[in-house]
């Protein structure tokens, strides 16, 4: 933790004054600053410490993470530098557990490598985060799904390469069984 303290103080906290957004991974100027910092964190074995080793993380338990997060929580740059930014970390776990091999190659690996950002779209204007009140629906249209509805408070949407969208697919089912998650590339019409 001594190294983390020093790294935060000397390298990351000064960046909080920089005019770059640490979540905009499409910005080449940002990546020129971010990549060397990420390498230092990887070299110390602290990259994505919250994720399991099979996802390239350290599999830290709650106490270890709490001690680390107490320090890294001082800078808005730290989540991008340490590979722990939300919603990317949660989306990585979803993709690792439920994604196809093709989805893992296209979305999970670049996410784990810190090359892209993602977005999780669940909250709705009329229902907040209560899935029992969601109205965004996905219906089959041949081999495709058509999603209709409105999501908001989707963190990092403007920087995301893809969204994971929660939509109602079985409206007659119990609340916890009526939803499905969809990977929606940012270039999809209607986003």
Question: What is each model feature region?
Answer:
Residues 1-86, 97, 102-113, 117, ...:
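Amphipathic, small/basic residue-rich leader segments at the start of a protein or domain
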Residues 54-56, 123-127, 152-153, 168-172:
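Short beta-turn/strand-loop junction motif enriched in small, turn-promoting residues
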Residues 79-92, 115-121, 150-163, 180:
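FAD-binding core of FAD-dependent oxidoreductases
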Residues 88, 103-105, 126-131, 154-156, ...:
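Short, well-ordered, mixed-charge alpha-helical segments that flank or form enzyme active sites
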Residues 137-139:
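A structural signal for short hydrophobic beta-strand segments in well-ordered beta-sheet cores
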Residues 144, 148-191:
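A short core secondary-structure module
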């Amino acid at each position: 933790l001594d190294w983390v303290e020093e790294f935060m103080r000397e390298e990351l906290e000064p960046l909080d004054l920089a005019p770059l957004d640490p979540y905009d991974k499409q910005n080449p100027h940002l990546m020129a600053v971010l990549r060397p910092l990420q390498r230092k964190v990887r070299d110390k074995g602290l990259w994505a410490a919250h994720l399991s080793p099979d996802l390239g993380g350290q599999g830290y338990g709650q106490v270890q993470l709490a001690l680390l997060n107490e320090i890294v929580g001082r800078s808005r740059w730290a989540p991008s530098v340490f590979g722990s930014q939300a919603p990317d970390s949660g989306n990585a776990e979803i993709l690792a557990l439920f994604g196809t091999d093709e989805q893992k190659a296209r979305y999970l690996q670049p996410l784990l490598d810190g090359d892209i950002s993602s977005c999780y779209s669940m909250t709705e204007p009329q229902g907040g985060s209560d899935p029992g009140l969601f109205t965004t629906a996905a219906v089959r249209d041949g081999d495709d799904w058509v999603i209709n509805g409105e999501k908001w408070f989707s963190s990092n949407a403007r920087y995301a390469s893809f969204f994971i969208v929660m939509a109602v697919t079985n409206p007659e089912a119990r609340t916890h069984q009526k939803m499905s998650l969809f990977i929606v590339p940012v270039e999809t019409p209607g986003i």
